């Protein structure tokens, strides 16, 4: 909807009923006890327009943080400043060709661009790492310092001593992307790379062993289903915009009238009146629930046996690999005929999950009798210490019922999307083949030369030769804020004889920026030209041609220029390989031309500068994961050793027998339930009786937008706690409480709400650390990682950031 009459907008009467019916954010707002929208800011913008404060220009751009969406923005500029933001106003906003409208985060982007705390000049550290003490230096000094130190470290330690830290603060662009330092390092011999991500480490690893890849049906395919079952899946907060999934889920359910069941410790915003049933569950126990559902499906003959026989390995003895022990198949495990001798009955699972046995039986019968059924899981359940096993256990429900590879079904993972075929700015090939897990970089700094393949998941060689000595940190708050166990990370980074140089390229003085040795001010993507691709786009792909809204202010520079200048200092061959003789503008035109060659109907470059976005609906109507495999498994085998769905994995059986694992670190050849560490039944609960889980908060994307005042007011940082637990501790809603465990401590307001299971607490991840790390180390900003662990999960060596035990007291 394009605003042409601000007076009419402000005079319009919006009823509570119409807001709830027509707006996802309406449901979201009314479901929350403390959610207020900054309508006064809208009134202010409308007053500007009404007074004739007309923009000198308006340009198309995009919000490119890591929510999984890339929403179109129309930035109105006057006096070289963005003063008003619209979103997508193109087309007729029809289903399948809808407007990619931004959420409140994207719509507040001018507050990020114009924020008084943005970095302005290059700086070097003059205090201890983490103190935030810097002095201004010239660009030449900064670039020379980086170049000299990088050359020294490459000479003294080799390319494996250089690492590019995981970061997603600039994500989704092509050249404006957190990955661009990879290209620079690959142009000069490579670097120690990583596998996995903080988002999906465990599920990606698990699905590679089960399906040979991680893929799901597009959310619009819910139009063809009879039942939607969501395990820890909350797109209404994680992907709530027009570029995300919530729109598709709503539209598809209108067409199918599918029943929707939400399984989550919290009554999340995806439920929030949309669901037919909410089943609250203890964090980390989804695998036990899945096993009990499987028990009902098997004992009541609700499985698709022909599918299991034809497409799968290891359901029963008929398809069990010859290398496996007797009764090592999935059916035996579920029925209690395997090694543990425990039947996975609903009564067994009820004690673990807190879901009553009769509810489990009812859910199992619904899943077994509704075909197709769209069973999916978000990325929350896998972000646990037992996350790999949980992800496989949930996916087994789709496998057992034969819902894989068909319309209206799913593989049991998160929703998939179509690919438009955008040409990407190549990161070049990395000559260094050694890799570490995305989560173990602090270990690689602290004791890298001791890290091995069988204990730490090192890939490409048996052990690391050298620790990390040089760290690139571009648009990344992972250095301290987004990584597990902040206190431990702080101690590792303090010793600058370990990691000798940390280079930060940032927009703000984040918690992580305070630990950098050289800190460079970056232009935001909205201040640059780029070709930006969709991500969570359902069955409609799109690409945005963003233009710079304003000229560079102070001494901020684009990342491409910055790294090109570093490349010059590394040698003319490195510079040529990195740039290929092109400017950023020339690269954008080149990438546009390549993308257009794959999509001939895409507008020419000059035309697209005016239209902003190109949309293309999937020709197959709905994307179906593993469809080709389902139709002809011989011609289209999966990327597993057998070419089939591997319920029993011989590769995992080998790892379980050869890797160095602690007693509570389990790799299993079957999708078996394992409790994990720091879970609901860990002995540590005697000291810290409440489970603490994280969630993705609508006020931020990870830590991006975490310093925007109106979003902080609309969505305050709180700890969710059930009234039963609050009453036992004398806590009332709004009280400041002390949350603590063996890792750290924070002070935070309490949100006392029945929307969370008793015995469980929750904190939205991504809030900015506000602690004196040289003093009491008590966080007052609500950063959950002051409480999380740096111990990785068993298989993926990923972040178990939702497996935490805490105590909560009134402060």
Where do the protein language model's features map onto the residues?
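Phosphate/diphosphate-binding loops
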Residues: 500-501, 548-567
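Long, well-ordered, tryptophan-enriched scaffold segments
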Residues: 266-370
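Glycine/threonine-rich phosphate-binding loop and adjacent beta-strand/alpha-helix elements that clamp
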Residues: 526-552, 567-569, 648, 752
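N-terminal export/assembly segments and adjacent metallocofactor-ligating motifs
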Residues: 2-302, 328, 461, 469, ...
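Long, contiguous, secondary-structure-rich segments that constitute the structural scaffold
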Residues: 559-611, 703-705, 709-720, 724-811
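Extended redox/cofactor-interaction regions of prokaryotic respiratory oxidoreductases
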Residues: 2-7, 178-263, 270, 288, ...
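Active-site phosphate/pyrophosphate-binding segments
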Residues: 326-445
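A glycine-rich phosphate-binding loop feature that marks nucleotide/adenosyl-phosphate handling sites
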Residues: 310-313, 367, 410-421, 579-594, ...
